């Protein structure tokens, strides 16, 4: 029986010793970390904005608008702050020099007190964050084909172009078609399409030959006669 009691007392003593040790180890990282102590003392996040920043002394307009802004906000609770600032600026310009003079005197007094309290003060305005412009352009595949429609004589005709050169030629063709009366629209479109295919496939003769065999050139029937026929 005494052996059992002694073992129980030993276990209780060990647990009592372990509990404070666990508590100390759990709080030691917080007390030993200088960053956490700095945040607790300053009440900020450790950056410059968390430190005590010295404010500029108020000028005459700020001294005058301090009470006027509160009055306008109470009279017009729905008015935004930007609108209140515009109204106060307009009212300040309408004041005479005699009406402004007491506020200039108060501003000079505040500036003198500020110089005595902060003799090494230097005004350092905050830099505005510049917006990041993304100059990244989406890559256009060379094999991608864009289709558009040409409106000629109140009819829509599909047209295909592959690159910027073809697009520029296509825009010139649209100007020509819109300025002049269209004559044989189908013939013009086929010739333009055949020209763009031949220019886009200029670097590969095998592919060009395949396209030429698949799409033979278009010859008007009026110009084709027996004298123009070729017999091998």
UniProtKB/Swiss-Prot annotation:
- Give the residue ranges for region: Disordered: 24-53
Chief place of localization: nucleus
Any stretches that span the bilayer, and where are they?
Answer: none
Under Gene3D superfamilies, the record lists: High mobility group box domain
Q: Any idea which UniProt keywords this protein has?
A: Activator, Calmodulin-binding, Cytoplasm, Differentiation, DNA-binding, Nucleus, Sexual differentiation, Transcription, Transcription regulation
Tell me which GO cellular component terms the UniProt record holds. Answer: cytoplasm; nuclear speck; nucleus
Q: Where in the cell is it found?
A: Nucleus speckle; Cytoplasm; Nucleus
GO MF annotation: an example: RNA polymerase II cis-regulatory region sequence-specific DNA binding
Q: Which domain of life is it from?
A: Eukaryota
Output one GO BP term.
male sex determination
Q: Looking at the keywords, is DNA-binding present?
A: yes
The entry's DNA-binding region: 54-122
Q: Which SUPFAM superfamilies match?
A: HMG-box
Q: Which Pfam families does this UniProt record tie to the protein?
A: HMG_box
The UniProt entry's sequence similarity note says: Belongs to the SRY family.
| Quaternary context | Interacts with CALM, EP300, HDAC3, KPNB1, ZNF208 isoform KRAB-O, PARP1, SLC9A3R2 and WT1. The interaction with EP300 modulates its DNA-binding activity. The interaction with KPNB1 is sensitive to dissociation by Ran in the GTP-bound form. Interaction with PARP1 impaired its DNA-binding activity.
Q: What does this protein do?
A: Transcriptional regulator that controls a genetic switch in male development. It is necessary and sufficient for initiating male sex determination by directing the development of supporting cell precursors (pre-Sertoli cells) as Sertoli rather than granulosa cells. Involved in different aspects of gene regulation including promoter activation or repression. Binds to the DNA consensus sequence 5'-[AT]AACAA[AT]-3'. SRY HMG box recognizes DNA by partial intercalation in the minor groove and promotes DNA bending. Also involved in pre-mRNA splicing.
Protein name per UniProt: Sex-determining region Y protein
Q: Gene encoding this chain?
A: SRY
């Amino acid at each position: 029986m005494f052996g059992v009691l002694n073992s129980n007392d030993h276990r209780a003593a060990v647990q009592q010793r372990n509990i404070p040790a666990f508590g100390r180890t759990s709080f030691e990282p917080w007390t030993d970390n200088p960053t956490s102590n700095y945040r607790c003392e300053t009440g900020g996040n450790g950056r410059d904005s968390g430190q005590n920043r010295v404010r500029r002394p108020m000028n005459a307009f700020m001294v005058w608008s301090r009470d006027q802004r509160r009055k306008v906000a109470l009279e017009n609770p729905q008015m935004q702050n930007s609108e209140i600032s515009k109204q106060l600026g307009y009212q300040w310009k309408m004041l005479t020099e005699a009406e402004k003079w007491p506020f200039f005197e108060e501003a000079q007094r505040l500036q003198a007190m500020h110089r005595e309290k902060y003799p090494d003060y230097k005004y350092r305005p905050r830099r505005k964050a510049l917006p990041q412009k993304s100059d990244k352009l989406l890559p256009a595949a060379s094999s991608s084909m864009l289709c558009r429609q040409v409106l000629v004589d109140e009819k829509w005709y599909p047209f295909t172009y592959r690159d910027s050169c073809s697009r520029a030629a296509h825009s010139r063709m649209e100007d020509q078609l819109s300025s002049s009366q269209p004559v044989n629209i189908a013939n013009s479109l086929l010739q333009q399409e055949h020209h763009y295919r031949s220019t886009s496939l200029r670097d590969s003769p095998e592919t060009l030959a395949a396209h030429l065999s698949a799409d033979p050139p278009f010859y008007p029937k009026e110009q084709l006669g027996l004298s123009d026929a070729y017999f091998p």
